């Protein structure tokens, strides 16, 4: 089994567990993205009934999002390629995925949660896509959130950068289960006990069939949204200004172009 710096990978009884452990907030930089995708490549050779994503107990967030510095013009192509590779791998693997959230899941962290089939959150969970405040937008969330929480609410979250708590996330069906912190692992074990009784191949076929509900594959949709992000958005003044202002710890001065 490969070793990693920013994640841990464990396999037990046909369940893989990818634990994010880049303290304190599991900020997703390019190196961490590549480790996650490397772990998924390793798992493609395993017989599994589920892949679990969670965070190390020493971390204060599931993930507070993608590193802002990786949105800089000289890094953004590599960042987007590395980040979206995770979602392409998840679609190709077609294994049931479970996110276990205790604390904030924001930006890219919320997108990873949105891509999972089952989401279990503690009452401390926070969810949102604040990218618009940096002058950019969340490509994966733009594709996935409308079908999960409804078009109008997805538009509101993405266009305002609103952060919601776990109770609201549960009401919107972004989370399947919201439980007290002390019951988080117990709820995960309850879900895993159900899938461990099932055929891995039946689960994979079911996952692939569910994905057919989209009018196009995630890979095809990502290619289109990447064109908007890289060829249009990242050439705008405001995208550069938003990232620069964040790094300089000041309010952005928008020019609306």
For each predicted feature, which ranges?
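Hydrophobic alpha-helical segments typical of transmembrane helices
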Residues: 82, 86, 140-144, 153, ...
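A short acidic, glycine-rich active-site loop
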Residues: 72-82
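Crotonase-fold acyl-CoA enzyme core
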Residues: 91-201, 236, 240-244, 250
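C-terminal alpha-helix plus adjacent terminal tail
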Residues: 1-13, 45-47, 56-59, 161-167, ...
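A structural preference for short, pocket-lining loop segments at secondary-structure junctions
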Residues: 13-21, 26, 31-74, 89-100, ...
């Amino acid at each position: 089994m490969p070793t990693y710096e920013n994640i841990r990978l464990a396999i037990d009884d046909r369940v893989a567990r990818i634990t994010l452990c880049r303290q304190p907030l599991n900020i997703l930089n390019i190196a961490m993205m590549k480790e996650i995708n490397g772990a998924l490549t390793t798992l493609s050779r395993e017989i599994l009934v589920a892949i679990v994503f969670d965070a190390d107990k020493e971390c204060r967030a599931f993930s507070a999002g993608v590193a802002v510095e990786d949105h800089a013009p000289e890094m953004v192509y590599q960042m987007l390629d590395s980040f979206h590779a995770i979602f392409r791998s998840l679609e190709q693997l077609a294994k049931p995925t479970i996110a276990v959230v205790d604390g904030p899941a924001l930006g890219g962290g919320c997108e990873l949660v949105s891509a999972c089939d089952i989401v279990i959150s503690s009452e401390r969970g926070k969810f949102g896509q604040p990218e618009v405040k940096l002058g950019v937008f969340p490509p994966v969330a733009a594709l996935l959130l409308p079908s999960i929480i409804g078009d109008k609410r997805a538009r509101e979250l993405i266009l305002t950068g609103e952060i919601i708590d776990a109770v609201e996330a549960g009401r919107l069906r972004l989370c399947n289960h919201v439980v007290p912190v002390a019951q988080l692992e117990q709820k995960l074990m309850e879900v895993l006990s159900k899938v461990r009784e099932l055929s891995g191949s039946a689960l994979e076929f079911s996952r692939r069939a569910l994905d057919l509900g989209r009018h196009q594959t995630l890979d095809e949709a990502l290619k289109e949204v990447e064109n908007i992000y890289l060829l249009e958005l990242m050439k705008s003044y405001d995208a550069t200004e938003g990232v620069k202002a964040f790094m300089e710890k000041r309010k952005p001065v928008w020019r609306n172009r």
